[in-house]
């Protein structure tokens, strides 16, 4: 996810984003035919932050500042699923931002959704469960100093892994809920200015994550006892990487580069190419999903504050996000 920045950082970020606007469309190679599926209402806080795929190809989406989760069909139709309880002060104590927002999203096989909530209050911040047709219930508490962000489920163990962007920690908690365990800390998770650990995925027995401030993608093996193995740096030089998705079972990665207003394809050797830019319709991308030859990109427009949207493009690489 991405945030409203301090003035100095905002100016620099705006300049970086503006630089992409003068280039030709970057939809190249495996990515083609980009088009906007859905425009959102910025003034209503409808800023799409994270996404989980339904079996039929529909998208479950967190609307960050609105504190909502909704379903979006492949034709752009919308259905509100749940609204998280709003803090009385609007989340004024939320770290870095100063307002509350819904963040990472995970869907289990029975249709239950798990959503991260950074609210600036001990009684609200943490992980919330939304059963089909039900109301949100907090299952794991984090302190007001936490910024739960990207999240993924290890289906082998039933554990959720949560990237905490301000406390520089990867938390682990069972689906049933409970007290989160600090699974991983270390220098690779440090933040220098805004956000540290951000996007998070489970892939082939390892936790993968982005560190936005450090511009890296990291791989952390999970050993047979569930402990974190040595942290491996898989890619560097990325401009504020946010959420990402694997192309099928490979180690090719599509990643949202929020401040650059770009989407990149990262190869297994760590090299990357830009495949989408602002000229294709991006508005500060925060998350991506891959399904049935389609690449979906969520843009929350946190810095641009213009046109939050969901963009879809054709992808000739693989079937579904992992």
PLM regions with names:
Residues 1-28:
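Secretory targeting and sorting signals
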Residues 34-42, 78-95, 135-141, 179-191, ...:
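A short beta-strand motif characteristic of beta-propeller blades
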Residues 41-58, 87-117, 121, 142-160, ...:
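Beta-rich, blade/repeat-based domains predominating
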Residues 64, 118-120, 165-166, 212-213, ...:
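Short loop/turn segments immediately following the C-termini of beta-strands
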Residues 68-70, 125-128, 169-172, 216-218, ...:
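A short loop-to-beta-strand structural motif that recurs across blades of beta-propeller domains
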Residues 72-77, 130-135, 174-178, 221-226, ...:
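Short loop/turn segments that connect beta-strands within beta-propeller blades
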Residues 126-175:
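Hydrophobic alpha-helical segments and helix pairs
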Residues 214-283:
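Glycine/small-residue-rich hydrophobic helix-like segments
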